[in-house]
Amino acid sequence: MRILLIGFEPFGGDAINSSQETVKAVACDELVGVDIMKEMLPVSFKMAGTEICRLIAESVPDIVIMLGQSGKSDFIKIERVALNLMDSSKEDNDGYIP
């Protein structure tokens, strides 16, 4: 089984992104028969979509797990519904606001 595990680079003035740190901390050699590919996406509305498509095409994973960080939450949440809206009141790391 191939798992693509994705985090994001820091943004919004933060020095670290908890999703990036979590992906880094996952031990890849402890699960027999499981190949975990760890990747980081840019916090860029223009680049992230292209990059995730490239990663999936190149690695052909069985499962894709994407982690994220929300400044609005102080605990872990599982997102049940992803709306995939390009909507934000804050700039991405390219200075772009959709």
Predicted regions and their residues:
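N-terminal catalytic or cofactor-binding beta/alpha core of small enzyme domains
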Residues: M1-P98
